[in-house]
Amino acid sequence: MKEIKIKKPIKIRKPTRSYTGIMWITNGTNKKYLAPDFDNRCAYCDDSDEYSGGYNSFHVEHFAPKEKFKHLEFTYDNLLYSCSYCNISKSNKWIGSNENESVLGNKGFIDPCNDDYYNHLGRDQNGNIISLTPLGEYIYYELKLYLKRHFILYNLDQINIRRRALKAKIKEKEEHGEDTRKLVKVHRLVCEIFCDYYDLLVKEEA
């Protein structure tokens, strides 16, 4: 019997480009606005820059490639905050003949700020990115979303959320003079698991 995959959204929160001011003609300035708009996460894979070298290691990605559509090079609605892996994988790939033709049949790319992006890609119960449609499969392979680092970083993120919540709960109980020994043990275990995943990431990128 075929195993049923439990689908989760590929991203924790759908990003929204909020900047509507003047057009900045440097990637550096645009990046300052893109980072918070995308929660410091890659637009495509949702990897956090926290575990990927930080803000300076992330790129300004041009959804419609600047090599083909020079007039969109600094248009904010065409820009994305991206990890180096997704940005380099996508490069100047573009299926259409104009800037608005991003998909032809089951090939092409969807702007991650578009709701439709989440109909084509998701995650399984373990945090691996999975394709949900033929178009999603095209994006999955073109952006190399099968890389193990995406699974590791997703789980690092989830464990860190739990670690921080436990730390806050321990602090709250300590302030009320309550017994925290059980929570401290759980927190220590979660920290060990976090370190194990971090070691996996280091080995993956070695």
List each model region and its residues:
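Histidine-centered nuclease catalytic patch
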Residues: D47-L79, K90-G105
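Short cysteine-rich clusters marking metal-coordination/redox-active sites
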Residues: C42-C45, C83-C86
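Short, charged surface segments at domain edges that flank catalytic/cofactor-binding sites
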Residues: K2-Y44, F69-H71, D77
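C-terminal, charged low-complexity interaction regions
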Residues: Y138-A206
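Generic alpha-helical secondary structure signal
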Residues: G28-K32, D115, R164, R181
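Domain-level detector of nuclease and nuclease-like folds
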Residues: K90-A165
